[in-house]
Amino acid sequence: MALTLYVASSNAGKLRDFRVAAGHTATEILPLPGLAEIDAPEETGTTFAENARLKAEFYSRCRPGGLVLADDSGLEVRALGLLPGVRSARFAEDAEYLPGSPLSADERNNLLLMDRMRGVEDRAGRYVCVLSVARDGVEIASAEGEVAGEILGVPQGTGGFGYDPLFYLPELEKTMAEIDLETKLRLSHRGAALRVLLARLPG
């Protein structure tokens, strides 16, 4: 029996990633209807798992009976004490870095990361993604995925989003922003988490 998952995210890149990762299954990935009109909950969790569950349970109340998928994901850099972590999307905003700049949030986040990593020898980092599915305010499944890499000093590639241009995969000698979408989803934290999650959902 086919499943329909309503994604509680306005991030077009994430929605695309989920659809590609689920493409070989009977699962239909749809945006949550009316998401733009819903006031987002405050992400008060201190871990990716807490925030993913909080969002899934909150948004599932807006789609009675439906399965709502939420994620919390980000970048952890060892030399920065695992920052930006759960604040990855708001890294520059939290630091009041380039306020009022016409640059996008992703661009400012990447610039701040480059600044913080200037002269740092330990370049190890990892992407982490936790997915949660809830129905009627109750989490019914969750899964985590991660991928290890290195943080570059300058961006490479124009694909992807977020920190992808700085996230280097040594085994491919490319950044996440330089690989095709199929390869990215095969290797990425988000693709790994979704594959585990789909196996855990009730048929």
Swiss-Prot record:
Its cofactor is Mg(2+). Keywords: Hydrolase, Magnesium, Metal-binding, Nucleotide metabolism, Nucleotide-binding. Disulfide bonds: none annotated. The active site is at residue 72. The keyword Protein biosynthesis does not apply. Its EC number is 3.6.1.66. Binds 1 Mg(2+) ion per subunit. InterPro entries: dITP/XTP_pyrophosphatase (IPR020922), ITPase-like_fam (IPR029001), RdgB/HAM1 (IPR002637). One of its GO terms (cellular component) is cytosol. It holds the Pfam family Ham1p_like. Mg(2+) binds at residues 42, 72. Substrate binds at residues 9-14, 73, 161-164, 184, 189-190. One of its GO terms (biological process) is nucleotide metabolic process. GO terms for molecular function: dITP diphosphatase activity; ITP diphosphatase activity; metal ion binding; nucleotide binding; ribonucleoside triphosphate phosphatase activity; XTP diphosphatase activity. It catalyses: XTP + H2O = XMP + diphosphate + H(+); dITP + H2O = dIMP + diphosphate + H(+); ITP + H2O = IMP + diphosphate + H(+). Belongs to the HAM1 NTPase family. Pyrophosphatase that catalyzes the hydrolysis of nucleoside triphosphates to their monophosphate derivatives, with a high preference for the non-canonical purine nucleotides XTP (xanthosine triphosphate), dITP (deoxyinosine triphosphate) and ITP. Seems to function as a house-cleaning enzyme that removes non-canonical purine nucleotides from the nucleotide pool, thus preventing their incorporation into DNA/RNA and avoiding chromosomal lesions. HAMAP family: Non_canon_purine_NTPase. PANTHER family: INOSINE TRIPHOSPHATE PYROPHOSPHATASE, INOSINE TRIPHOSPHATE PYROPHOSPHATASE/HAM1 PROTEIN. Homodimer. This is dITP/XTP pyrophosphatase.
